Amino acid sequence: MKTLKFYAIFLILAFIMLGGCKEDQKKIIKTEPITFTKEGELTIYKEQSDSVLVKYNIEIAESDYETQTGLMYRESMELDQGMFFIFPDVLFHSFYMKNTKIPLDLIFIDDKLRIASFKENAQPMDETGLSSEVPVQYVLELNAGQRKQYSLEIGDRIAFIRM
């Protein structure tokens, strides 16, 4: 009788131990990369001559969700692409680079569609605030270096169309 109890206890302990040795199953979550969605085109014109400086395909951020997430979690952006933010009011707008993996130039644009100020070479993942120097209604995010490459200046004009 003692041996039967011994074997019963042994079997119970063996099952408990084997169950406890089960290897943890780690879930692998596959995330899809966020891709660019062309929603319009934007052209920047030189202030004095009205000559075309550069044209971009733009993704438009207009809703609260779109303006809050912007280019977060994106791995890259083509040189002819940008994120164009449209705000309902002319205000001092501030951005930061939280969860943004691409260095950016921020072009702040007033309600008359003129470049009002810049923040150049904003660094990925930096949560320092990047504010416009004057009240603006639009902001264009481009790959870092675009402002210098195309000699964009305060007063240059933009025009955009939605697709």
Regions found by a protein language model. Give the residues of each.
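C-terminal motif of bacterial Sec signal peptides marking the signal peptidase cleavage site
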Residues: 17-20
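Compact, glycine-rich, soluble single-domain proteins
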Residues: 22-163
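Bacterial N-terminal signal peptides that target proteins for export
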Residues: 1-8
